[in-house]
Regions:
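Domain-level representation of secreted and single-pass membrane ectodomains enriched
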Residues: 2-350
């Protein structure tokens, strides 16, 4: 079954064939598109954790897009000792620890060349209500955009990643020797090799700009904070949300919901120094959305960079490119910190 699934992916990846990776299989899987689903309810109650490993599909892989088609884990609970909300059940992907409800969210994970992606589900509550279905898509980039490890000393016996997609062994046995023959250098074989080792056009469209943890490619849509449907956002989160757009465009953000902490307890929105201090102070409230080159649509004189507090619902913000939002939360948590919901639209700049 595994070989058949791999062959289907190789021959017809453009039609979206996906293969399923099992929990705690003990080995990594090297496939272009992978589905991760939760075990059955009976098995969930017996598991303390669930671990997955995904090996790079090719040497050109630089990113993996993770679509959380369904992700519902227990809501964070208050730690009596620290008085902070903490995830009991969670999924850990690099620096991200997610719990609660995150259906429809996505993440981009940036990888160094040859790096294996690891996903770890902690299931301490043994809840039968935990459910997830994730689709992982490996994205191949142009060679100069593939991140190299910080230190990569040469080793004669170091494992080598495939430089050509694994379709070649099949083709070499099926196609005439005039293509894969000894005298085919510079001919059809070289052209085919170049095609197979180049990133797919679909990959280039999916590729997120460097530093983006979420990437929205459509000209309009909605953006919400993690665990927005469940209640509160988590402490100590920092990530960048990017939207595709050209130099001649502008973006509007209509705020449907906005509830972040603020330096003082006064009700209403906060800007800049209300949200972020240039001097790091322990215990200071510092949750914010950072939106560069932005202003409030009905008051163009108001041009903050940091937004926090509450009372912004119904407002519209306008920003020029690059279209990026930085979200940051501090170590403190409160049940009033329910996050944000924005509707964005990219249009021709006036």
């Amino acid at each position: 079954m595994k070989s058949l699934c791999l062959l289907l992916l190789l021959v017809s990846s453009s039609i979206g064939v996906r293969c399923q990776l099992q929990c705690n299989s003990g080995s990594s899987v090297r496939q272009k598109r992978i589905v991760i689903r939760n075990p059955g309810a009976g098995e969930l109650t017996k598991l303390d954790s669930c671990h997955y490993e995904v090996a790079p599909w090719s040497a050109q892989v630089c990113q993996v897009r993770i679509d959380f088609e369904r992700l519902e884990l227990a809501q964070p609970k208050l730690n009596a000792s620290t008085q902070l909300l903490e995830c009991v059940d969670f999924v850990q992907v690099q620096r991200f620890q997610l719990c609660g409800r995150n259906n429809g969210q996505h993440l981009y994970v940036h990888l160094q060349r040859g790096q294996t992606l690891k996903l770890h589900f902690n299931l301490a509550s043994h809840s039968t209500q935990s459910t997830w279905q994730l689709t992982l898509t490996q994205i191949e980039c142009l060679q100069q955009h593939t991140q190299q490890p910080a230190a990569a000393p040469a080793a004669a016996n170091a494992p080598q990643l495939p430089t050509v997609r694994p379709l070649l062994p099949f083709l070499s046995n099926l196609l005439p020797r005039t293509i894969f023959g000894a005298n085919s250098a510079g001919g059809p074989a070289a052209q085919l090799l170049q095609t197979l080792t180049a990133p797919l056009p679909a990959d280039l469209e999916l590729q997120a700009p460097l530093g983006c943890d979420q990437y929205w490619r459509s000209s309009s849509g909605g953006i919400v904070s993690f665990n927005f449907a469940g209640g509160v956002y988590m402490a100590n989160m920092k990530y960048a949300i990017c939207v595709a757009g050209g130099a001649d465009r502008e973006i509007s953000y209509k705020i449907d919901h906005f509830a972040l902490s603020k330096f003082n307890d006064a009700p209403g929105p906060g800007y800049d120094t209300d949200c972020h201090s240039t001097v790091r102070t322990l215990g200071r409230a510092s949750d914010y959305l950072l939106i560069p080159n932005s202003y409030v649509a009905n008051n163009q004189a108001l041009q903050p960079t940091y937004y926090c507090g509450n009372g912004l619902a119904g407002s519209k913000l306008i920003a020029r490119p690059p279209f990026v939002i930085h979200f940051s939360s501090d170590a403190q948590t409160s049940d009033t910190e329910t996050g944000f919901q924005l509707i964005y639209a990219v249009t021709q700049a006036i």
